[in-house]
Amino acid sequence: MNIQQGKVWKFGENIDTDLIIAARYLNTSDPQVLASHVMEDARPDFLQHFTKGDFIVAGENFGCGSSREHAPVALKTAGVSAVIAKSFARIFYRNSFNTGLPILEVKETDEIREGDTLEVDMAQGTIKNLTRNQTYAFKPIPPFMMELLESGGLIEHAKAKIAQGVL
């Protein structure tokens, strides 16, 4: 999980959970079904061009709106390596770690363009824009939160701890 490389899919400010996964799909909790509809209201052709391992880059307040775990689950299951944004809605932030979706706060998202290739080093806290030869730093993810990501989310982390006899 430490170093990931992929293409950028750029979105704007205030991308709410209804744009990530529309409310009409909330009658299912099947991650594959959710993933098959991710971002379709924001960009109908998104999944036709998206490749697993790519990144979503956005502005302020990504994941605002209603509190639904479906949104980070849909992104993670679709294969989004990480969401990189200037800021995140707090409940989306927490739900993302709980479901194992990496999210990174970076102030320079305006410098990153659609189609750029990024290399993200989770351990070093750096993002290299290989297209533009620029490097951006992000606040390192706290150790416990990294454990959640590496385990695949809070439930998988708890299962592993129980299996180890720690919980």
Curated annotation (Swiss-Prot):
Catalyzes the isomerization between 2-isopropylmalate and 3-isopropylmalate, via the formation of 2-isopropylmaleate. It comes from Wolinella succinogenes (strain ATCC 29543 / DSM 1740 / CCUG 13145 / JCM 31913 / LMG 7466 / NCTC 11488 / FDC 602W) (Vibrio succinogenes). Heterodimer of LeuC and LeuD. Belongs to the LeuD family. LeuD type 2 subfamily. GO terms for biological process: L-leucine biosynthetic process. Keywords: Amino-acid biosynthesis, Branched-chain amino acid biosynthesis, Leucine biosynthesis, Lyase. Disulfide bonds: none annotated. It is an enzyme of class 4 (lyase). It holds the Pfam family Aconitase_C. One of its GO terms (molecular function) is 3-isopropylmalate dehydratase activity. Pathway: Amino-acid biosynthesis; L-leucine biosynthesis; L-leucine from 3-methyl-2-oxobutanoate: step 2/4. This is 3-isopropylmalate dehydratase small subunit. NCBIfam families: LEUD_arch (TIGR02087). It catalyses: (2R,3S)-3-isopropylmalate = (2S)-2-isopropylmalate. Its EC number is 4.2.1.33. Signal peptide: none annotated.
